[in-house]
């Protein structure tokens, strides 16, 4: 066979001129650009395109699925999958538990009957594998740059930025205002969703790269922002948005009215929070759902404490009844029945009323859909199309929420239908505690105000640079978003900072167009059952802050990895070789994964059969059919 293949990296401009259709991740051009020649095009899968942290999802799934094909042990394949995953996201176990997985909404498998690949479950499994194996993050260079970078905040954005910069040989110091790391991951997400030991282990892995950590250190109090800029070659601001928004209605300054951010912070910090028997949560976002479900668990703890005290009284009464039994069995039988009924009643919590008020319908709720469903299953009551207009107070404490019914009108700027008050529909919801989960804003430290916009968010350009040279920012401090978005911001900001420290011009990263399901042969893929994580029973979940779900088992993970359709990259299905009428295609596993197929162009007649047979959209004809 005459080898005429070359591997080229093609610029966006050249590629658009030649293809006129899509931007590829990488093209393997074989035998020139004739329209008759099969061209192997490694394209961006839609899952990665939808992932805010740009994880190589296809890469780590197919590494596991094809382990046997490349004669790797399962352990070796999982180790490699972990390395691929953590190249972009150093907190896989964490995000495998909390991420709303937009990647799954992008997955092309959703267009089949068996649904999207359970990417989030796989991320959690791979992350846990890394922790169980005590795998360590590796530096990209052993040479230190001599440059120092200050990272303000140890939330997902700050941790991600510190991780990437440390791998590149820079000396990184994290300044954290709280007593522990994690930002909203620790102080805003309940432990039943994210256990503290999981977060601690992944943060420690980042620190083990040589990152210095200074907790209980607030910029503006312990060190000025100006001094910080002088002492470090670059500064990344990842402060997050820890201040809960308020509604500006009468009575919200009452002692028993909290924002969701402050409420969750207190609970997660271990502070005792008394909420009483009737809790009202205002809002339909993630913080509101977390606050509602945490309230239910706090009430269960109070109920358990009371039940324990009453159980002691029950035991004493039962002993007295047993003594009576020696003389009057009939009377004692009645007393026993009454006592047992009373004890059963104690098991039903009277501290179980948590009500969520939301001004639109459930379909418009911005919270993670899964969390809304779980909240309903746990017994949380939803008052939809309901807006608070005031707070009823008595002696400086809130006793109720004044509400009005709403109806939906025309869509607003967000695309959701605008809620309109219904005249004469006012009513009051009684409460012992009110929690407002309507949003959060940053608390900028002294000296940072000049970097903010008129709404109080830090302003950055597309490379995450502020108007001040050497100062960069990302994560919730520039606008609220999900945690993986903050991880992506931290990584991209680190890329900018690295170029800045080296005096390099940063080339703009161009977004590739993902392969669509309509460009694939979907009929090739047989139905395969999706592998779901197991949940603990609701009655147990609502009485504990222990994790409510279990990581999938190895057999499930292996099966789930094989559900990946490897969109845009060869997975050695052999269809092209089987159907080639000229027997011009051969396969060799000595080549890298994804590039095992090879065309002998001395035999190829350009019939397009390989292109039509390829299920994953990898084979194009020439420079675009």
Language-model segments: which ranges?
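N-terminal Rossmann-like dinucleotide/flavin-binding domain of flavoprotein oxidoreductases
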Residues: 80-89, 122, 185-233, 368-381
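N-terminal Rossmann-like FAD-binding beta1-loop-alpha1 element of flavoenzymes
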Residues: 147-173, 288-295, 341-342
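Glycine-rich FAD pyrophosphate-binding loop
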Residues: 170-186, 307-321, 325, 355-362
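FAD-site-proximal beta/loop scaffold in flavoenzymes
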Residues: 255-279, 306, 312-322, 391-393, ...
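Internal hydrophobic alpha-helix adjacent to the cofactor/substrate pocket in enzyme cavities
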Residues: 291, 297-307, 336-351, 484-509
């Amino acid at each position: 066979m005459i080898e005429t293949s070359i591997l080229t990296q093609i610029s966006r401009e050249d590629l658009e001129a030649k293809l006129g259709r899509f931007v590829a991740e990488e093209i393997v051009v074989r035998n020139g650009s004739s329209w008759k020649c099969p061209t192997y095009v490694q394209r961006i899968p839609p899952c990665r395109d939808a992932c805010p942290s740009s994880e190589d999802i296809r890469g780590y799934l197919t590494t596991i699925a094809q382990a046997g094909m490349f004669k790797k042990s399962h352990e070796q394949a999982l180790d490699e999958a972990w390395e691929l995953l953590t190249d972009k996201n150093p907190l896989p176990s964490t995000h495998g538990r909390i991420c709303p997985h937009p990647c799954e909404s992008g997955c092309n498998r959703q267009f089949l009957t068996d649904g999207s690949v359970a990417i989030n479950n796989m991320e959690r499994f791979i992350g846990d594998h890394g922790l169980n194996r005590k795998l360590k993050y590796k530096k990209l260079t052993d040479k230190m740059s001599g440059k120092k970078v200050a990272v303000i905040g140890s939330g997902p954005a700050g941790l991600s930025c510190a991780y990437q910069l440390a791998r590149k040989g820079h000396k990184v110091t994290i300044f954290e205002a709280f007593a522990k790391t994690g930002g909203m991951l620790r102080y805003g997400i309940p432990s039943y969703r994210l256990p503290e030991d999981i977060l601690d282990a992944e943060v420690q892995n980042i620190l083990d790269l040589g990152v210095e950590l200074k907790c209980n250190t607030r910029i503006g109090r312990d060190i000025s922002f100006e001094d910080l800029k002088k002492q470090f070659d670059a500064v990344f601001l990842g402060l997050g948005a820890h201040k809960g928004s308020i509604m500006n209605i009468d009575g919200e300054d009452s002692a028993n009215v909290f924002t969701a951010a402050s409420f969750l912070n207190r609970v997660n910090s271990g502070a005792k929070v008394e909420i009483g028997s009737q809790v009202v949560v205002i809002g339909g976002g993630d913080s509101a759902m977390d606050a509602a479900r945490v309230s239910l668990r706090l009430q269960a703890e109070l109920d358990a404490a009371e039940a324990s005290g009453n159980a002691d009284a029950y035991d004493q009464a039962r002993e007295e009844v047993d003594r009576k039994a020696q003389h009057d069995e009939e009377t004692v039988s009645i007393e026993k029945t009454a006592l047992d009924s009373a004890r059963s009643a104690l098991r039903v919590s009277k501290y179980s009323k948590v009500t969520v008020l939301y001004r639109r319908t459930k379909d418009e709720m911005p919270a993670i859909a899964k969390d809304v469903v779980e909240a309903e299953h746990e017994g949380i009551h939803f008052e939809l199309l309901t807006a608070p207009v005031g707070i009823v107070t008595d002696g400086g404490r809130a006793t109720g929420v004044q509400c009005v019914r709403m109806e939906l009108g025309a869509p607003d700027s967000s695309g959701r239908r605008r809620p309109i008050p219904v005249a004469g529909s006012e009513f009051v919801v009684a409460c012992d505690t009110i929690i407002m989960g309507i949003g959060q804003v940053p608390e900028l430290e002294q000296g940072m105000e000049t970097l903010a916009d008129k709404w109080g968010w830090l302003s950055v350009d597309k490379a995450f640079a502020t108007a001040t040279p050497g100062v960069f920012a990302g994560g919730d401090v520039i606008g609220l978003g999900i945690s993986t978005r903050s991880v992506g911001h931290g990584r991209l900001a680190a890329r900018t900072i690295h170029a800045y420290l080296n005096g390099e011009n940063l080339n703009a990263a161009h977004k590739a167009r993902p392969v669509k399901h309509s460009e694939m042969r979907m009929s090739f893929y047989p139905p395969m059952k999706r592998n779901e994580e197991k949940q603990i029973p609701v009655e147990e979940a609502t009485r504990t802050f222990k994790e409510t779900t279990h990581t999938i088992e190895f057999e499930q993970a292996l099966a789930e990895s094989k559900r990946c359709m490897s969109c845009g990259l060869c997975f050695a299905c052999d269809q092209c070789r089987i159907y080639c009428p000229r027997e011009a295609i051969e396969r060799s596993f000595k080549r890298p994964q994804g590039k095992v197929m090879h065309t002998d162009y001395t035999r190829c007649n350009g019939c397009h059969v390989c292109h039509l047979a390829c299920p994953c959209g990898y084979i194009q004809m020439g420079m675009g059919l």
